[in-house]
């Protein structure tokens, strides 16, 4: 089965071209704008320059600390300013079209993005919340579809429609906080925030949407708003080498590499981008990543595929390749999806692989499979929902709005 996939992917292009560009609505949302951009919008509605810094701070607080969903909620902002903003702008986030809750507490949302082009279909992305005993992780998307064609990834089977804007990326986090009632001024169980970590591991390749991802993560990590530490934000890439160093310099978050193979021949099949940026170049970029240290280790993600990349020889070569890189290895049991050409490694083999890597001095946790009962493979909820009739989709949407 893997051989068939390899033949198919060998002929596939390394990267897809976006089918569309973003068209803003007539009344765009202020979410995702920098402080300088917010000041400019305030100037557009006649707020004097001497007041703009104060008004920006007020807006920032209401948007990202309190999670305001309308200008009317912003009671510390003058009524004239609120009215002026409401005439030209919104604070809308993506709309929840479907919500699924797993038996293990994992939540998955299908989010519809507003568009300013009546001729374009409204597009949808996925966002997943994974609660654990010591943290709550939100998995965020960066593209509608994906630039890449990774053989084992469900999103890789979808078209690349377009890049998300910074506002659409930040909006996913705000929707999750809305649904979980997790804003800073609200009570949560045990007094702790539910969303403590962000991972850019949803739909899309973040480093092929660099500027929007950078701008979004700088907003998310701002301690006067959403306030999630950069050490609790992880950006995952399949290996867009030219932008890895740039990510360290301009964003400064934790780095994860979707490695999945230790030989170029196999990685060319699993992650076709490897034909452009082979393993040696990728690992050198990791060695050069600004700020990497034992306290800020780079995570190497390794999906366990039965009979493909899970031998002890693979484990030995993995350890050899990572020598000198402050690293941990995240072993991921393959999450099957309809039509996939691979199977998950046997659990005994996963444990042997993990034990070898651990004994070589690397942390090698096996990621616990989560949300398998709710189409949790990345991109699968979107694909399955697209198959529904208009009436079925409307029913799903109504359920999501009333939950």
Curated annotation (Swiss-Prot):
A GO MF label:
4 iron, 4 sulfur cluster binding
**Record has Acyltransferase as a keyword:** no
Required co-factor(s) are:
[4Fe-4S] cluster
Give the residues the record marks as binding S-adenosyl-L-methionine: 204-205, 236, 258-260, 335
Output the superkingdom of the source species. Answer: Bacteria
UniProt remark on cofactor binding: Binds 1 [4Fe-4S] cluster. The cluster is coordinated with 3 cysteines and an exchangeable S-adenosyl-L-methionine.
Q: Which SMART domains match?
A: Elp3 (SM00729)
A biological process from GO: tRNA methylation
Cite the entry's keywords alphabetically.
4Fe-4S, Cytoplasm, Disulfide bond, Iron, Iron-sulfur, Metal-binding, Methyltransferase, rRNA processing, S-adenosyl-L-methionine, Transferase, tRNA processing
**What's the top EC group for this one?**
transferase
**Disulfide bond positions:** 139-378
- List the residue ranges forming a coiled coil, or say none: none
Electron transport recorded as keyword: no
Q: What is its EC number?
A: 2.1.1.192
User: What residues does [4Fe-4S] cluster bind to?
Assistant: 146, 150, 153
Q: Name one GO cellular component term.
A: cytoplasm
For this protein, what reaction is catalysed? adenosine(2503) in 23S rRNA + 2 reduced [2Fe-2S]-[ferredoxin] + 2 S-adenosyl-L-methionine = 2-methyladenosine(2503) in 23S rRNA + 5'-deoxyadenosine + L-methionine + 2 oxidized [2Fe-2S]-[ferredoxin] + S-adenosyl-L-homocysteine; adenosine(37) in tRNA + 2 reduced [2Fe-2S]-[ferredoxin] + 2 S-adenosyl-L-methionine = 2-methyladenosine(37) in tRNA + 5'-deoxyadenosine + L-methionine + 2 oxidized [2Fe-2S]-[ferredoxin] + S-adenosyl-L-homocysteine
Where does the Radical SAM core domain start and stop, copy by copy? 132-375
The note filed under miscellaneous reads: Reaction proceeds by a ping-pong mechanism involving intermediate methylation of a conserved cysteine residue.
Q: What does this protein do?
A: Specifically methylates position 2 of adenine 2503 in 23S rRNA and position 2 of adenine 37 in tRNAs. m2A2503 modification seems to play a crucial role in the proofreading step occurring at the peptidyl transferase center and thus would serve to optimize ribosomal fidelity.
- Kindly provide the name given to this protein in its UniProt entry: Dual-specificity RNA methyltransferase RlmN
Upper lineage is:
Bacteria, Pseudomonadati, Pseudomonadota, Alphaproteobacteria, Hyphomicrobiales
Give the encoding gene's name. Answer: rlmN
